[in-house]
């Protein structure tokens, strides 16, 4: 899926900004968070985040939930490179494994599991 942030900012500018952020804030990760295009969930009010390295994916999801003001009973899923990362994973580990060549970590969020079933989870009737 194409990133709106990438469309609006040239590669060299994004790369320079990510490098500047990593140099100035060594304990933080530059993250771009955007809504999956066809999701019915609200748009987040800002898409650029400086995330502490020791934050978990679950804690980051909580931050996004608060920013888009959705009720706790509504599901939210985040995707990085079309995968659903484990909620206990540290953002620093996810960043090292999935950062873009421009230095940002691109996160998509949706109100539904857009990319299909979660492996290993079976439905019961």
Curated annotation (Swiss-Prot):
GO cellular component: autophagosome membrane; cytoplasmic vesicle
Organism: Komagataella pastoris (Yeast)
Membrane association type: Lipid-anchor
CDD domains attached to this UniProt entry: Ubl_ATG8
Subunit structure as annotated in this protein's UniProt entry: Interacts with ATG4. Interacts with ATG30 and ATG32.
Site (Cleavage): 116-117
Family: Belongs to the ATG8 family.
Function: Ubiquitin-like modifier involved in autophagosome formation. With ATG4, mediates the delivery of the autophagosomes to the vacuole via the microtubule cytoskeleton. Required for selective autophagic degradation of the nucleus (nucleophagy) as well as for mitophagy which contributes to regulate mitochondrial quantity and quality by eliminating the mitochondria to a basal level to fulfill cellular energy requirements and preventing excess ROS production. Participates also in membrane fusion events that take place in the early secretory pathway.
Lipidation sites (Phosphatidylethanolamine amidated glycine): 116
One GO term of the biological process aspect: autophagy
Places the protein is found: Cytoplasmic vesicle, Autophagosome membrane; Vacuole membrane
Name listed for the protein in its UniProt record: Autophagy-related protein 8
Chief location bin: membrane
UniProt KW keywords: Autophagy, Cytoplasmic vesicle, Lipoprotein, Membrane, Protein transport, Transport, Ubl conjugation pathway, Vacuole
């Amino acid at each position: 899926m194409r990133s709106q942030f990438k469309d609006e900012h040239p590669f060299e500018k994004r790369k320079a900004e990510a490098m500047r952020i990593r140099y100035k804030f060594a304990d933080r990760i530059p993250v771009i968070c955007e809504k999956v295009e066809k999701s019915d969930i609200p748009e987040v009010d800002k898409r650029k985040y400086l995330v502490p390295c020791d934050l978990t994916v679950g804690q980051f999801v909580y931050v996004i939930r608060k920013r888009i003001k959705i009720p706790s009973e509504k599901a939210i899923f985040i995707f990085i490179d079309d995968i659903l990362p484990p909620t206990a994973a540290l953002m620093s580990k996810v960043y090292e494994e999935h950062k873009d060549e421009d230095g940002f970590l691109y996160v998509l969020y949706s109100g539904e599991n857009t990319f299909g079933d979660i492996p290993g989870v079976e439905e019961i009737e």
